[in-house]
Amino acid sequence: MKNYPVVIIGGGASGLMLSSLLPSSSLLIEKMNQCGLKILITGNGQANITHDEEPREFITHYFDKKSFVSHAVYSFPPQKIREYFREKGVETTVRTDGRIFPSSFRSRDILSALMKTNGEIITGTPVLRVKKDGNLFITETEKESFSSPVLVIATGGRTYQKTGSTGDGYTFASSLGHTIITPRPALSPIRINCDTTPVEGISVPSVTLTLGKKEITDSIVFTRNGFSGPTAENISHWIDGKTELTVSFLESFEAQKIKEENGKGSVINTLSKLTSLPHSLLEFLFPFLRNKNNASVTREEMRKIEDTLLSWRVTADTSRTEDKAMVTKGGVDTSEINSRTFESKLVPGLYFTGELIDVDGECGGYNLSFAFASAFLAAEDIRKRI
C-alpha cells in the first residue's frame, strides 16, 4: 500500500485546482481516462469560469447558501481567480453581461492550466471505497490501495454522468458518517406538460418565469418538451416534482390593439408585429388564430391571447434531466462542513470541495467559482498540516 500526505478523489474543477495548490507529494485519482471532462463542456465549450462582481453581490447568487459560501468567495473572489489563470498563461475577458471567460473562449485552455500541477495524477482508476483506519484514510481501487492522513473528496455531483459525475462521492461521504441532502438536477432544462417540438430551437430574449414567490426574467430556448436557457435553468433550483409554472412573454399587452390594425390582415402577423415574438411561436400558442384575420377575432379569443401572453400556465418538472442539468442541488450537508476550511466537522482530516457539497449557484460562472474557492480554502488549511 502506497502512502501519501494527501489523496484527492476526483479530477474535476475543484480537484484539479486543489492539486495545483498543494505540494508535489499529493495524489489525485480520477475515474475517467481524462481529467476535467465536465470543464470542457462548461459554458457551451467556452468555460464561463466566474463573474465580474464584488463578493457582497456575488454571494447572493447561491440561493439559501449565501452565508456558507461567503468566506470562500471573499477569500478567492473573481479577481483572484483571474490572477490564478493569468499566472498559468491564460488571459481572461469580461463579457458585457459580466460573465468571465478565457480570452480564447476555449474551455480546453482552462483545463490545460489546471493540469499544470506538481502533484501525481492517476486516471482511468475508479475508487471502490474509502474507510478510516486509525489516523489514516484508506482509498481502495481495483488495482491497489492508498493510505493518507488527509483525504479530499471532490467527485462532483450527479449530472452529465458521461463526464464521470455519477454520484460516487455521496457513497464515500455517507460511509464516513456524513448526511447527504437528496441530490437532484439544478441549472436544468425544464420539461412541461405539452409537446413543444413545433417550436424547438426558438429563442425568446426576455421571458419571466414565476414559481410561487420566485420570479426570474431572462432568455429561454424552447426544447422538444419544454425550455432551456438561463431563465429556465435558474428557476429549476426550486422545482421539485411536478409544479405549476407561469410563463410571461410580455409585461403588458392589450389585445384590443389588434382591432386597430387592418381588418383583413392576418392575426398572427399582427401579433408578431405588436409583440416582436416569432411568427412560429405565436402559431404554436394560438392554433385557433392561424386562418383568422384581425376583424374576425372575438372578445373571447382576445381574452385568451392576453392570458397566454401574460400568464401562460404550465405544469413543469425537472425529472429525467440528469444528463442535461449542469449542476446538482443537494449533496453533503453544509452543516457538517467547516465553511472556512472545508474540513469535515465529523471526521478530522476529511475535506469536501466543489459540487459534491450541497451548494448550487445560478448561471453565470458561480458554480465553477465555488469549485475553485472551496479548493483554495481547503488547500490553505491542508498545507498547514502536512
Residue ranges and their predicted role:
Residues K2-G12:
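Beta1/beta-strand and adjacent pyrophosphate-binding region of the FAD-binding site
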Residues N33-C35, L40-I41, I49-H51, P55-F58, ...:
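An anion/pyrophosphate-binding glycine-rich loop and adjacent beta-alpha core
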Residues T123-L136:
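A conserved short coil-to-beta-strand element within the FAD-binding core of flavoproteins
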Residues T123, E283-D360:
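A glycine-rich dinucleotide-binding beta-alpha-beta segment and adjacent secondary-structure elements
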